[in-house]
Regions:
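C-terminal binding/interaction regions
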Residues: 5-7, 21-22, 69-95
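Long, acidic, intrinsically disordered low-complexity segments
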Residues: 1-25
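S-adenosylmethionine-dependent methyltransferases
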Residues: 16, 23, 27, 39, ...
Length: 95
């Protein structure tokens, strides 16, 4: 199959994928806050660098899981990393 980066993802496919993840891993609707995850990815990609978005999302999940994994802890981890990326200084000039 094609790599994900070679495909475009219509909004309904995003919902379908999220539903599949929720079912596979027995997650509730609040366990996978799509809008906050996408915000994190966008802010990190723009504020830090595009390649840092996937592992920043992974880090948010890891932090949330180690903190107990409640929906509130998921939101807190996402918000913390999003805030860090939003305040990240532009390092493109310092070479």
């Amino acid at each position: 199959g094609k790599l994900m980066s070679e495909r475009t993802l219509p909004p309904e496919a995003l919902d379908e994928w999220a539903a599949a993840l929720r079912e596979r891993f027995n997650l509730g609707p609040d366990d996978l806050p799509i809008a906050l995850i996408l915000d994190l990815a966008r802010v990190v990609a723009v504020g830090v660098a595009r390649p840092t978005a996937p592992f920043s999302a992974f880090a948010a999940g890891l932090v949330a899981g180690r903190s107990g994994g409640s929906p509130e802890q998921v939101r807190e981890a996402l918000a913390s990393i999003t805030e860090l990326a939003a305040s990240w200084p532009d390092r493109s000039e310092s070479a």
